[in-house]
């Protein structure tokens, strides 16, 4: 078979060489490095590698997003001879292909003409050891499924560890989104796939140190707005309640609440803007399926981490919760109760130690 591997890059000098030399397969493959405008040593490093490794091509774009780079690679597959690519992968430039694992995906793809996707497990680097990502724990054995049979696939909104039939090169990433650009293309591919082969082995490891798109007010506002947009868009694409619950759980718990925790730990003072954003998100949840516990977890994040409450901001928060059927006391009672809850939480944490 013939495999095309798309790697979008932008200022990845710390990891790109390690990724490229980790790619090995018995199959015929080519690597398309699509750079979005690196200003570090990423491009020179890629240009030097063809002397050591075959199959590497570099396409340079200017001021291009990750989505644009990936779409350029997909366009290249569509424009070349159909016999040049039977399948493709997109690999994050901060990832690494674990030794001998790429051919686990290609072997599964070749095994059955109805296989349109092959999905392996992803790993993260924990003190030098590869650990299985919790979202991939449902892949317990090698088997063939569909999205209807295995809705847990919707918790894996990443290209890493996935191999696609070349026919899906007609799909596109959303270039209007900076962080969730791959959600719609992945959901469409899963929905269109005749069969999906699950491989219960860790294929790709992620070397990336946690990065957050919510370090300041402007970034946080933009990120939350994007999450609300993609959440609504994908929820409208999913027909089955179980699929919508699993996808919304991933977005509400991991993308939204984890980012909210990070932002509020950096900026604990409660502001009107923060409460309004959380209000908008909570109200948007009411128009679709969601896991109830996630709503309470979001509320706990705001109340436990938030500091410097004033009467006006609290009243906005209180009215928001009343609209979704959750009662809150008057301002003074809230402050007293919150102080008690925080003290009890700290005491419980100390006892656990």
From Swiss-Prot:
GO terms for molecular function: glycosyltransferase activity. The keyword Translocase does not apply. The keyword RNA-binding does not apply. Keywords: Cell shape, Cell wall biogenesis/degradation, Glycosyltransferase, Teichoic acid biosynthesis, Transferase. The lineage of its organism: Bacteria, Bacillati, Bacillota, Bacilli, Bacillales. This is Putative glycosyltransferase TagX. It is an enzyme of class 2 (transferase). Its EC number is 2.4.-.-. One of its GO terms (biological process) is cell wall organization. Belongs to the glycosyltransferase 2 family. It comes from Staphylococcus aureus (strain MSSA476). SUPFAM superfamilies: Nucleotide-diphospho-sugar transferases.
């Amino acid at each position: 078979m013939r495999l095309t591997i798309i790697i979008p890059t932008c200022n990845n000098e710390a990891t790109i060489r390690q990724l490229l030399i980790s790619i090995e397969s018995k199959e015929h493959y080519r690597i398309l490095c699509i750079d979005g405008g690196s200003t570090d040593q990423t491009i020179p490093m890629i240009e030097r590698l063809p002397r050591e490794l075959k199959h590497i091509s570099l396409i340079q774009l200017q001021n291009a997003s990750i989505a644009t780079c990936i779409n350029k690679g997909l366009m290249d597959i569509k424009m070349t001879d159909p016999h040049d690519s039977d399948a493709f992968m997109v690999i994050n430039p901060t990832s690494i292909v674990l030794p001998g694992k790429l051919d686990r995906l290609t072997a599964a793809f070749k095994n059955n003409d109805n296989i349109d996707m092959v999905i392996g497990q992803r790993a993260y680097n924990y003190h030098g050891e590869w650990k299985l990502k919790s979202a991939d724990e449902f892949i317990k054995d090698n088997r063939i499924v569909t999205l209807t049979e295995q809705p847990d696939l919707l918790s894996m909104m990443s290209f890493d560890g996935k191999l696609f039939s070349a026919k899906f090169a007609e799909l596109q990433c959303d270039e209007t989104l900076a962080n969730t650009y791959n959600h719609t293309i992945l959901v469409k591919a899963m929905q269109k796939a005749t069969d999906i082969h699950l491989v219960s082995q860790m294929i790709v490891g992620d070397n990336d140190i946690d990065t957050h798109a919510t370090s300041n007010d402007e970034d946080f506002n933009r990120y939350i707005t994007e999450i609300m947009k993609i959440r609504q868009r994908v929820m409208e694409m999913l027909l089955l309640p179980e699929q919508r619950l699993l996808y919304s759980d991933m977005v509400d718990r991991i993308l939204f609440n984890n980012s909210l925790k990070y932002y509020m730990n950096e900026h604990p003072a409660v502001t009107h803007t923060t409460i309004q954003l959380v209000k908008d998100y909570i109200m948007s949840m009411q128009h679709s399926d969601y896991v109830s516990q996630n709503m309470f977890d979001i509320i706990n994040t705001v109340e436990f981490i938030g500091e410097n409450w004033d009467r006006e901001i609290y009243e906005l928060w209180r009215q928001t919760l009343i609209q979704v059927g959750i009662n809150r006391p008057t301002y003074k009672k809230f402050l007293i109760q919150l102080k008690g809850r925080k003290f009890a939480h700290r005491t419980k944490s100390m006892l656990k130690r």
